[in-house]
Swiss-Prot record:
A GO biological-process term: glycosylation
E.C. number: 2.4.1.-
Applied biotechnology uses: Soapwort saponins possess anticancer properties and are also being explored as enhancers for endosomal escape in targeted tumor therapies. They may also serve as precursors for vaccine adjuvants.
Record CDD domains: GT1_Gtf-like (cd03784)
Protein name: UDP-glucosyl transferase 79T1
Annotated function: Component of the oleanane-type triterpene saponins (e.g. saponarioside A and saponarioside B) biosynthetic pathway, leading to the production of natural products with detergent properties used as traditional sources of soap.
Similarity comment: Belongs to the UDP-glycosyltransferase family.
Originating organism: Saponaria officinalis (Common soapwort)
Listed pathway(s): Secondary metabolite biosynthesis; terpenoid biosynthesis
Sites where the protein binds UDP: 265, 323-324, 341, 346, 349
Tissue: Mainly expressed in flowers, flower buds and young leaves, and, to a lesser extent, in old leaves, stems and roots.
PANTHER family per the UniProt record, alphabetical: GLYCOSYLTRANSFERASE, UDP-GLYCOSYLTRANSFERASE 79B7-RELATED
Domain of life: Eukaryota
Amino acid sequence: MSAKMLHVVMYPWFAYGHMIPFLHLSNKLAETGHKVTYILPPKALTRLQNLNLNPTQITFRTITVPRVDGLPAGAENVTDIPDITLHTHLATALDRTRPEFETIVELIKPDVIMYDVAYWVPEVAVKYGAKSVAYSVVSAASVSLSKTVVDRMTPLEKPMTEEERKKKFAQYPHLIQLYGPFGEGITMYDRLTGMLSKCDAIACRTCREIEGKYCQYLSTQYEKKVTLTGPVLPEPEVGATLEAPWSEWLSRFKLGSVLFCAFGSQFYLDKDQFQEIILGLEMTNLPFLMAVQPPKGCATIEEAYPEGFAERVKDRGVVTSQWVQQLVILAHPAVGCFVNHCAFGTMWEALLSEKQLVMIPQLGDQILNTKMLADELKVGVEVERGIGGWVSKENLCKAIKSVMDEDSEIGKDVKQSHEKWRATLSSKDLMSTYIDSFIKDLQALVE
């Protein structure tokens, strides 16, 4: 008997860092003949439709983002909301899409619904005869930590006090954010545990080679199947070329000499920290290209420059707020070092690149991803922070020099370790095996 062709609904959190990985997985499902209905806000459709590689198998359905007090007018995505404290209102808006979401599900009758932040999806799935799969596109380590802290800090029969909730753990991110509101009448912690405890199965965008022990821990704690998709990165575009201005600029410098620094499209540095970081790049005396949003309170990058900076680096340094072709830049032979925030998607791109890695994590799972790369896999270095998490120009320069100087033992060691892991992870058979196994798990779930 042939395996069932599935109809899968995708409903990710309204952030491109979630929506894009969901779409990459949709493309993999569609390649093998499965049907996908991908539900998203209208403005996101404009950005994502070109990433749909199988339009005959993947259908986009837009959903209206309700107006919520405190949410900026027209906001449909975290990118529309620079102030991270207002993201709770977007979560409220997501929850208020439930009636329209239910109408869509009732109409199309899917076999499986994959979701993340919309913790109530399992209730909808049960109502209409579908299976629910919580898909985590952040590191399994960070999800495991939230479970560990709550279950192990205090006796199970004793409620946590506010002081216990605020307690910090050495070398781990401050977890008080888990207990703050994330939506109307719900905390981030309750949303996260609800997402994972109510579903029929958990899927993680990772692989056993990197996070096997964390995935096994999640399976044990939630007493359910945890299936892995692998990192699900897009295939490199055949013949993809770098836009002319960047290609021409990079080609001016010798092989492996350029620093490429990127912090993602959803994070905004404080002005003084932005200035310190670009001064640190300048201090290395190496050419550099930095892609970053304008700092908080600034309309443009240029208005935040320290005095004299633009003139001093005009021949070897560029800072831009434009979207850049990150993967294509990472493949350019002039680039030798990737300075990044270690968001989960960026982490995989960094691991699969041939560049030296320097990490400056900013928040959430980025801190744990960095610990994994720097301390466990030993494929890069983390920039040392000062009081209050401050990244000084001296410490940034020191970290970069430690991996870029030809005679540096640290640089040699992380390069050797990185090459080993890149060889393992770049195996096409390895990644296709994960997708094949994931699809079989979905088919078994609906039988």
